[in-house]
Amino acid sequence: MKQLLDFLPLIIFFAVYKFFDIYVASGALIAATALQLVISYMLYKKLEKMHLITFVMVTVFGSLTLILHDDSFIKWKVTIVYALFAIALGVSQIMNKPLLKSMLGKELIVEDKVWARVTWYWVSFFVVCGLVNIYVAFSLSQETWVNFKVFGLTALTLINTVLTVLYLFKNMSEEDRKELK
């Protein structure tokens, strides 16, 4: 249920874009992200920081897109969110308080050097995705960008997540692996 809730705004954005245009889809994205927060709070009695940050970014860049009737803003949002994620992960690692370890370290017990590699891997991933987003958003058609944003970046993120879990699992002790099964 939680994963479906995470994809709700993206699904609504894509569906509305296909029937209308980028501006109606941007408005729908703002509404869907707000709805995501409400449902998340109702179900889990808390709001995740990532959802709050995403809501603020979607609201700011979606509103600018609507008010100025310029799709550049909603396109830049993707890159800026990825940049913020990369910065947050990188800074947390430099300060020896890795975010990924704090989020997953209780379930996935591996050495700190493994968490460091995973963190820098994700920093690199977010930087590359942000740069590729800029290229696709401003060099190719709007429809290509929407498809890339919805399917390409989502697929890349899912693949990256699976690779990360496999890498972490590979670096766990045999005993810790058995506890997860």
From Swiss-Prot:
Q: Which Pfam families match?
A: IspA
Domain of life per record: Bacteria
State the membrane topology: Multi-pass membrane protein
Q: Could you state one GO cellular component term attached to this entry?
A: plasma membrane
Subcellular localization: Cell inner membrane
Task: Name the InterPro entries for this protein.
Answer: YciB
For this UniProt entry, which segments traverse the membrane?
Answer: 10-30, 50-70, 72-92, 118-138, 148-168
Q: Which UniProt keywords apply?
A: Cell inner membrane, Cell membrane, Membrane, Transmembrane, Transmembrane helix
Q: Which NCBIfam families does the entry mention?
A: ispZ, PRK00259.1-2, PRK00259.1-3
Instruction: Give the family, as the similarity comment puts it.
Output: Belongs to the YciB family.
Q: How is this protein named in the record? A: Inner membrane-spanning protein YciB
User: What is the species of this protein?
Assistant: Shewanella halifaxensis (strain HAW-EB4)
Query: Organism classification, top ranks?
Result: Bacteria, Pseudomonadati, Pseudomonadota, Gammaproteobacteria, Alteromonadales
